[in-house]
């Protein structure tokens, strides 16, 4: 059983590359986005984890869109390939999964667990999209090591705190 937690994510400035693509194109897009971000930062360390934001369904029939993001400092400028946007502060519900759980179709269970959790149901209505927040590089870890968080931004709290 997956453990669902919540956390606060402060407002942050993000480098962004967004593309409409199908599931079979995701790995190449991720490699390209990571390389473009690294080249643009020119050796400077990112200030947050690499994330994939799913603005729509990405599978064999649907093409997203999918957005690769990386938190950046205020001095990073947009380019032809990289947009810059500010994401509002928000709370999110998440579960952390291993590389084995990350493989398709096992990853769908993690998405379902978070999406159907009491936290997400009670605070639905966020305008932000679900995401994968990466903790490790897939090629650098074994199947039993943690790879990413599956996260759903939460809507505003209602009722007493």
Features from the language model and the residues they span:
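A solvent-exposed interaction/effector surface
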Residues: 1-161
């Amino acid at each position: 059983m997956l453990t669902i937690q919540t956390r606060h994510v402060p407002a942050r400035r993000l480098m962004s590359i967004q593309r409409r693509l199908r599931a079979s194109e995701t790995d190449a897009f991720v490699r390209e986005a990571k390389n473009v971000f690294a080249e643009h930062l020119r050796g400077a360390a990112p200030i947050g984890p690499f994330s994939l934001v799913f603005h729509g369904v990405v599978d064999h029939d649907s093409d997203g869109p999918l957005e690769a993001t990386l938190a950046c400092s205020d001095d990073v400028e947009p380019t032809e390939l990289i947009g810059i946007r500010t994401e509002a502060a928000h709370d999110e519900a998440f579960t952390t999964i291993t590389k084995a759980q990350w493989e398709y179709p096992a990853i769908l269970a993690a998405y379902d667990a978070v999406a159907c959790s009491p936290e997400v149901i009670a605070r639905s209505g966020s305008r932000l999209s679900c995401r994968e927040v990466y903790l490790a590089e897939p090629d650098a870890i074994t199947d039993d090591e943690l790879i990413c968080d599956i996260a759903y931004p939460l809507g505003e709290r209602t009722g007493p705190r």
